[in-house]
A protein has these predicted regions:
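ABC ATP-binding cassette signature C-motif
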Residues: 1-271, 315, 322-562
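Intracellular alpha-helical coupling/juxtamembrane segments of multi-pass membrane proteins
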Residues: 258-291, 295-301, 305-312
Length: 562
């Protein structure tokens, strides 16, 4: 429970600007209570990760003051965490309980000393060893350290960490994040800073993490685009909007309600301001020379109003998904498809039929075969048996997770345009800059080098590259990773307006609930279930089908016993 009388961290007038004089944080005043659960939201580039780095003590180049109450610890999960590549998964995870590991090591060292002549021949040294051994025994008993291995195994299983003996240097980006998160949760810092903690976690792991954080004694501050996570965990929302930090007491749904009302008020104010601007502009244009002095004063008034209008305007995000050729009734049908890698069977006798105008959400644990399914449909891999029947009118656009085809040394505009002002889309030519603007790349954003893009910007660019081909069937592999909540809404609206069929791999439950007409669920044990309805309806159906039998890992267990 949050203690609203114990402030453990404060920011006093904190501002942050980059070398290009862009101010991302402006005069932030905040105080965090012990035990509070805070979700940070805002557009990409609004300063969310910068704020986290300041709190973590990694960024000291700011104006203002940061005050920690003495005696409290801070732990930080970065988007790209640093791990020691010379260690194994278990060795890294054990760093989270280093004091326990050190206690066990010292206890073992003392036991070894009992057999050395320099100790057993010296009564004083033996007495000192016995005394220290007793102290360590009390610590070990109090922390249940003898069961450390089973506790670490439970922690790694909860977050789907790779095998404990796997070298860290061989891990993927997602695996590294899961290992780093496991290590951090075992440390139990008083202030837990999580930058996109749900990225690369499957739904079951996210459910487990939500329950763990709900019961977490310390303060949790999380940057995340997962709106269900914000609903279930956050008791406060901190919105970063045009440099300002706007706190709200409540979860995401309650914040969304007040945000809508606030935007309505801003629109009314903006409407009045626009009318005033129009009158001022008309007067300025018509003012005779005889009233030049007054004209200058009113021109200054006009400029002030214009600046306020620019300041108050919040950009409406839009992602445009062009419709491909008309899609017939036959889309893609899986018939008795099977696929295995060695002894690992991903699925056997897979059957489903994609709906012509549907949006199919693909869910399941990491490694279950979701991405493999897309690669099989695209012909990038071969089925072991069965087949995919593809309709004659189908034109597939595939957006994978890798983004390997983005040249980091080219600008956004160069990647999309190929050096041409017009790009060919179907039977028509489209202005390349206009096309990019439909994916929320403004004029200055279009000149950014791709190597400098954020994760969300790279996702939008990759989406624009794939959709340029005007497919009528979209295969989207984790398109919601690394993009902010506003961009997520724009993507949802773009998909809802899309006339073809979309198949989307995602762990974002809010996203799945809002747009999906069908769910293709990888349920474990090589079983795949095709369901017509939303994600929540699928979950209800799943509980009815399973009865009291819960799948492995659904039941919540504490990371470490107290």
């Amino acid at each position: 429970m949050a203690d609203d009388k114990k402030i453990i961290f404060s920011m006093v007038g904190v501002s942050k600007s980059f070398q290009n004089n862009k101010q991302v944080l402006k005069d932030i005043y905040l105080s965090f209570f012990y035990g509070a659960k805070i979700g940070i939201i805002g557009l990409n580039g609004s300063g969310k990760s910068t704020l986290m780095k300041i709190i973590a003590g990694l960024d000291k180049n700011y104006q203002g003051e940061v005050v920690f109450s003495p005696g409290y610890s801070v732990g930080y999960l970065a988007q790209e965490p640093h791990l020691d590549d010379t260690k194994t998964v278990k060795e890294v995870v054990m760093e989270g309980v280093q004091s326990v590991v050190d206690t066990l090591a010292e206890y073992e060292e003392i036991n070894n000393k009992f057999g050395l002549p320099e100790y057993y021949e010296d009564p004083e040294k033996m007495d000192a060893l016995f005394a220290r051994q007793a102290e360590l025994q009390d610590i070990i008993d109090a922390t249940d350290a003898w069961n450390l291995d089973s506790k670490l195994e439970r922690a790694m299983d909860a977050l789907r960490c790779p095998p404990e003996d796997q070298p860290v240097k061989n891990l993927s980006g997602g695996e590294r994040r899961r290992v780093a998160l496991c290590r951090l949760l075992l440390q139990k810092p008083d202030i837990l800073l999580l930058d996109e903690p749900t990225n690369h976690l499957d739904v079951e792991s996210i459910d487990w993490l939500e329950q763990h954080l709900q019961q977490y004694e310390g303060t949790v501050i999380a940057v995340t685009h997962d709106r269900y996570f914000l609903d279930h965990v956050a008791g406060w929302i901190l919105e970063l909007d045009r440099g300002e930090g706007i706190p709200w007491k409540g979860n995401y749904s309650s914040w969304l309600e007040q945000k809508t009302k606030r935007m309505e008020m801003e629109e009314k104010t903006a409407s009045k301001r626009r009318k005033t601007l129009e009158r001022e502009l008309e007067w300025v244009r018509m003012a005779p020379k005889a009233r030049q002095a007054k004209g200058k004063a009113r021109l200054n008034s006009y400029d002030k109003l214009l600046n306020e209008d620019v300041k108050e305007k919040e950009e409406k995000l839009e992602i445009f998904i062009p419709n491909g050729p008309r899609l017939g009734n036959k889309v893609i049908e899986a018939k008795h498809v099977a696929k295995a890698y060695g002894d690992k069977l991903l699925f056997d006798d897979l059957n489903f039929m994609l709906p012509p105008n549907g949006i199919v959400g693909v869910i399941g644990p990491n490694g279950a075969g979701k991405t493999t399914l897309f690669r099989l449909i695209m012909g990038l891999e071969k089925v072991d048996k069965g087949e995919f029947e593809v309709g004659e009118t189908v034109k597939v656009a595939y957006v994978d997770q890798q983004h390997k085809d983005i040249d980091p040394n080219k600008t956004v505009y160069q990647v999309i345009s190929g050096g041409n002002d017009l790009i060919r889309m179907g039977n028509r030519d489209v202005n390349a800059r206009a096309y990019l603007s439909r994916f929320n790349f403004s004029g200055s954003d279009q000149e950014k080098l791709c190597g400098m893009l954020s994760g969300g910007e790279r996702n939008r660019l990759h989406l624009a590259m794939a959709l340029k081909e005007e497919g009528n069937v979209l295969l989207l592999d984790e398109p919601t990773n690394d993009i902010d909540v506003n961009t997520l809404r724009a993507l949802e609206e773009g998909l809802e307006d899309f006339a073809g069929c979309a198949v989307v791999i995602s762990h974002d439950r809010w996203f799945l609930d809002r747009i999906c007409t069908h769910i293709l669920a990888f349920e474990g044990n090589s079983e795949v279930f095709f369901f017509e309805g939303s994600y929540t309806e699928y979950e209800e159906n799943k509980m009815k089908r399973m009865g009291n039998v819960e799948p492995k890992r659904v039941r919540y267990r504490k990371l470490m016993e107290d």
